């Protein structure tokens, strides 16, 4: 593979995460305007965004098999066509059914692109370099999550219709589409080059189960925590503005942490540092949940920094459980994380209703403790060390 080709594929991976981050995180900014557009209460409008998450989940799950049937370049180019149709649907339709369908299509495109982006990184880089590259790729999710809400605020403040926000997000996919030209993608399944030696199917092992449970509990815990921090902070007497600043600080330190750990991870065994970070994150979340408002800003900043590398390291270790990176395995771990996203309000909503926001935060803390236990148990069964030794020879 030529260096220019590798750079193009790496940028496609970066932008695939930026696309998903923009679509998921911008929701809160535009929901009120969309509710007004359709003359609906915000509470019922929020349910239609489930179509976005459902599209992401289904496409990540199915793409484990589709990757071996439909070439990656073809998928990305077809995704561009779907993106144009979805954004056009949002612009020219006044039907809630068509809006929901467009959201589902955006979710499908986003999920397919993100799963391809993840696979490209696991395919092109090996060992500890794979972990640092995946982490840097994941930072584009957070970066888009900071940039696109600012773009949305800029447009909405000037009374520009909400659907132009999605047109701006569509420009990310335009860049991906342009990068596919003159770019060679790894061939999979029936399109892969034939070899004389038969390819032995590798068993995944119990380590994949531990990692999948960790991925689900981590995302469910993280989103369950950050979704209810504003309500919890307001209950302690903080202003809405200060409560919002806590969330912004979390994502800012999360992004800085990703950049820092993309260098730090190269010098440590991934399973060991993952166990340490998961334990630290559980302790720091407990400090935040039981601390005074005066210490909240510092504890959420440190929590964001030290938890930033956990999810990507889980995916990296998953990809290292087999000698040859398996798209099905990587997508399975990703799917478990996406299920955590889907379950966020299903799990935390009733808890808040019955016991208040702090109970939801303590539940999230319990989920982080489960992540720590899974990462600790992984140390006894993980195959990443033997595969790293083989690739280094």
Swiss-Prot record:
A Pfam entry, by short name: MFS_1
Superkingdom per UniProt: Bacteria
Topological category with respect to the lipid bilayer: Multi-pass membrane protein
TM spans (from-to): 11-31, 51-71, 78-98, 101-121, 134-154, 162-182, 206-226, 245-265, 273-293, 297-317, 332-352, 361-381
Subcellular location: Cell inner membrane
Primary subcellular site in the record, as a coarse category: membrane
SUPFAM superfamilies (UniProt xref): MFS general substrate transporter
Record's GO cellular component terms: plasma membrane
Keywords per UniProt: Cell inner membrane, Cell membrane, Membrane, Transmembrane, Transmembrane helix
GO molecular function: transmembrane transporter activity
UniProt key word Membrane: yes
Family: Belongs to the major facilitator superfamily. TsgA family.
Protein name: Protein TsgA
Source species of the chain: Shigella dysenteriae serotype 1 (strain Sd197)
Gene that encodes it: tsgA
